[in-house]
Amino acid sequence: MEESRIAFLQRLINSPSPSGFEQRVQQVIREEMQLYTDEQRTDVHGNVIAALNPNANPRVMLTAHCDELGFLVRFIDEKGFIYFATIGGFDPSTLPGERVQIHTAKGSILGVIGRKPVHLLQSDERGKAPKLSEMWIDIGVNHKEEAQELVAIGSIATRAAQLEKLHGDLVVSRALDDKSGVFTVVEAMRRLHGQREKLKAGVFFVSAVQEEVGLRGAHTSAFGVDPLIAVAVDVTFTSDHPQTSKHEIGDIRLNGGPVISIGGRINPRVYQMLIDAADEAGIAYQIDPQASGTGTDTDVIQVSRAGVATGLLSIPCRYLHTGSEIVSLKDIDEIAELLSRFVLALDAQTNVIP
């Protein structure tokens, strides 16, 4: 992957966007989408919607969510220690010792999530996950007044982890769930823009907000866009590391290619068109059977208005909802290519009735 594109992914990661506070990353996305689309707008919830060939049919929505996990400052004690609420689904055991950035109007403040040292834990506390009430953020001050000069109640914070390269095609960062998905859909739009003379469908890009707290942005944006077809891009678990079971979650691997979901939330014709596009492009893929809900924006998009023909493409990801999520740039590139080829195959005669 070109370094300039990796740099754009880095910009997405560097723009904090806890659920409900996505404005900074959405500004980065708006600026990028002006290069590849004919129209751009932001709705009342903060979803960024950008259209390429907007008057054509069928209308297809390509979406990923831009929000990430985060923290919300709730209280500062007399010694300047900061207590917080979590935004999204954290495993509390991953938090003690984590460095965080508290984002303020004057800039970011570095802090550390503190907890009583292991040496001081009582016997009944050892081996148990810590409670949020037993943790705080330490920014290195001595008094409440010092902390208040730097941090306001209601400030947001994110883990301080940034994008770094691992071996081969792998990268590690916080918030790859789902900024890697946003990046993938932007890449697909960039490729479609470069081939717009072949494009017959109207394509609506959506960078959706508030997925981590209830799939909210996808719910409202799908109603507004009113697509016939929608494909969401998110991350999914892998079974290629210790303490996971292929029997429970299937055989999903990093560098194994796009993960294509099948199940009750997935339109069977859209599923087959994604398979066909992958086969024609020579892209290896992985199948993820979803017996009930997918836990992604697909679930609410499917039942928008009179119904939407939905598909779900997933990026294999290790260690979800930690500060060290791992994905493959190769998988991302292949999903972007698959998505663009899928869209180019759509026309006014496309039938999605099961």
Model-predicted segments: where are they?
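N-terminal hydrophobic/helix-forming segments and targeting peptides
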Residues: 1-354
